[in-house]
Amino acid sequence: MHRLNAGVVAILAGFTIALQTASGWSQDSARFNKQRVTFKSGSLTLVGYLFKPDGPGPFPALVWNHGSEKNPGGSPQFDTVASIFVPAGYVVFAPMRRGHSDSEGEYIVDALDREEAQRGDLAGAKLATRLLETSQLDDQLAGLAVVKRQPFVDTNRLVVAGCSYGGIQTLLAAERNVGYRAAVPISAAAQSWAGNSELRTRLKTAVSRIRIPVFLIYPPRDANLEPARVLGPELERRNRMNRVKVFPAEGPEDEQQHCFGGAKGMHVWGSDVLAFLKDVVGRRA
């Protein structure tokens, strides 16, 4: 369900290629005022990266949720997200959940591997759903609290996005009344959908409760497009501002796969997402 299958390998390969070829990565970090931030989630000390436009603000802000990869902070993922949103006037905060990169706590994939080894795949699937909606979500919301404390952030214009496990996190957070104005889940549950009936039910429930605009996005060759076919119509039925898009099969093949191949494929969805967010948070509330 959560192991490094072909889709994840493609993402990691995309991150590696981007790391090798993005000569402007370090320059972008400075240009986007990148800061390493530590913060608490319960008793754990977590780490995140904060990016902001020049000037005092107040700016709209985006919380970016990474996937299940062990070391999201060691790739160009966050800098690439910043390269899309900071020039458009957004603060970006990328909290790293427990066990990822330099954040304290147990890595979720290690916990799931152990549960599956001891109790089987069904138990692993149930644990994944429970962790995603409890401790993992707690970590995201602790990151959101960091954003809300920044004096240069307009707390009336907060949005959330993320890919894969991060897409699931985005939907679960959108269900909560925590202050987000819009949500952009990308490749949400595409790798978990077929093998986890509990997660399918949980996400259907979440979608039925979401009251903020959602833009649900999938690449054309994602691991599974059934989430778009199941969750999409319900979203569109509930709110005329909601959007669902499976992108056309264009461009390099790896950018048509899970999470658009990672950092190198973010340009595929960037302009669509910015246009969607402009409609929702383009003016101060």
Where are these regions (language model features)?
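Alpha/beta-hydrolase active-site loop
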Residues: D110-Q150
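Short substrate-entry loop that stabilizes the transition state in hydrolases
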Residues: G57-F59, G67-E104, S192-W193, N224-L225
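Short glycine-enriched nucleophile-adjacent loop
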Residues: G167-V178
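N-terminal cap/lid segment of alpha/beta-hydrolase-fold proteins
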Residues: W25-G57
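C-terminal catalytic histidine-bearing segment of alpha/beta-hydrolase fold enzymes
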Residues: M241-A285
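Alpha/beta-hydrolase fold nucleophile elbow
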Residues: F152-S164
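The feature captures the conserved acid-bearing segment of alpha/beta-hydrolase catalytic domains
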Residues: A182, A188-R243
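Alpha/beta-hydrolase
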Residues: N65, P95-R97, I186, F247
